[in-house]
């Protein structure tokens, strides 16, 4: 592998601009070689003056790059030293507190089941667990800095060697010896000392002297490009996808020859449509993950996942393919229920029951850590007013907004099985003979409208919570206003539907209101998508017309196509309303929903690429490459006090003499920011534990 490719594959994406600009140096050298005057047509002195002038410019550029690298390395090293001191202090405080409360001196003697601990002991136990996670993440940051040191030195050595080869001189080697090999970023060995001290602290204080266990916790994943998936995972992905395609063809043929009446078809479609959308979402999320990795968008950091243990795109494809096979088999079983001894209504229950069990399975199998992380995240989303909202929280809530049809189909399935299903009919999903046919598919009692509003409500209260935490009306209250338009849209759609069924005279009034609020909502969300979520239409875009100053994906056409796609699908409701308002055939609304629901999932798939790109560029602007792990978050008063104590000679070590903390927990491990340094973005999100159990 050429060094340029090696460098590109191994850099820390958030620090990209702080590395040696190796490609730019190569271009300088090759350009100088191509533009050099020929000895055959000019005298030798002219050629020498040309190369002397070029070398002067070249080495000036090298000096600027070297100064940039020295400065960045020194800043990051100083930050690491401060953080290590804070971590050591917090560890000592936690250990001292445990010794005082429990009366023992070693971690091993203190270990007992968590449910036997008092409240104070639980807090201390949690602090130790958080400290293990914080040291693990800190160790990763040290390895990244060490990698930065090695890559830049190798880059200088390679480019100066190339300089000497092209110009047939030894001045490049002399410059390396006189400048690079004595540069602080190369001669400073404190990073190696910090790595050794961190390993020693974790081994002796947190893992009872078990170095093997400590190094397993501190293990850093390969820093290069994405590692190839295990062969069996790749095999299963191919196998599942192949079977899924064959089963889909079989489904189409079976649907043509087996389905007879609308009374049988539409309950099946409504019940199985949500499962298909979920499978589509998982598959497209796998493509998202692959695209992020290829483009260098650090989604692991953005979602604050465990960098040592998380799902790759191969795993997501595998899950989607496996669930897709089960979905096809379940639907085929319904088609052939007349020749089966199992009642037809069992198959949907078995399918969705398995999906739920797969998610909540308490055993440490089938991607236990990832499933548990998702469950915790779902809990945070549905209890949004009671937690600080991070990026992963509102990202998942945004996904739910595009998957609202799944919630509506789930509500329909529960209602259908509870009130409409004819249980004595084992061969088809026939509704019973109610006075109101298809009772569960109507807005009559408002339940469907409420269910349809749930995802927008979750984002609405998340925005209010973020406003409460930050006191910034923009963007949080403005964003809440965007989601509130969904409430009006759904309300007037429901009123129009019910009034149309009952042939009320004011039906058209609700149709016009529905159209007006759909237009307002679409314009609002479209502008927010392009300007706020994607960061496009930046006035400083320069040559990236209508985009932003810096873009990650290689082709500008991707951005322009995404803009057009977002405009079209944001206003796809115009087709839906036009057909719904003019058609008199039954089930037109079902047909429209079945067609447009997968398109909305696709729109969200495209949205994900550019939303995470924007967040990634924010991280690059802050040079944030690892997670911010806190033992206990600081309130405003605590943070002010901490900053004052850091200015004192004693630092933070004697802080307990100055004040009794509101919470009997350790202070934040994160280096406190001044108000002028803070960003509007708050990305502290739920993280996975780094326990020793395997993910699979």
From Swiss-Prot:
Bilayer disposition of the protein: Multi-pass membrane protein
Sequence intervals crossing the membrane: 229-259, 265-296, 310-337, 344-365, 389-422, 430-471, 473-503, 507-534, 554-585, 588-626
UniProt keyword terms in alphabetical order: Cell membrane, Membrane, Phosphoprotein, Transmembrane, Transmembrane helix
Modified-residue entries (Phosphoserine), positions: 668
Extracellular-facing ranges: 260-264, 338-343, 423-429, 504-506, 586-587
Residue(s) carrying Phosphothreonine: 690
Residues the record lists as binding phosphate: 398, 401, 482-483, 570, 603-604
InterPro entries per the UniProt record, alphabetical: EXS_C, SPX_dom
Residue ranges occupied by any SPX domain in the UniProt entry: 2-224
Any one GO molecular-function label of the UniProt entry: phosphate transmembrane transporter activity
Residue segments, region Disordered: 672-696
Span of the signal peptide: none
Gene Ontology, cellular component aspect: Golgi apparatus; plasma membrane
PROSITE patterns: EXS, SPX
Intramembrane residue segments, as ranges: 366-383
Superkingdom per UniProt: Eukaryota
Region of interest (Important for inositol polyphosphate binding), residue spans: 158-165
Subcellular location: Cell membrane
Cysteine-cysteine disulfides: none
PANTHER family in UniProt: SOLUTE CARRIER FAMILY 53 MEMBER 1, XENOTROPIC AND POLYTROPIC RETROVIRUS RECEPTOR 1-RELATED
Assembly: Homodimer.
Domain notes: The SPX domain plays a role in the regulation of phosphate flux. Inositol hexakisphosphate (Ins6P) is bound between two SPX domains of the homodimer. The SPX domain has high affinity for inositol polyphosphates and its affinity for inorganic phosphate is two to three orders of magnitude lower.
Protein name: Solute carrier family 53 member 1
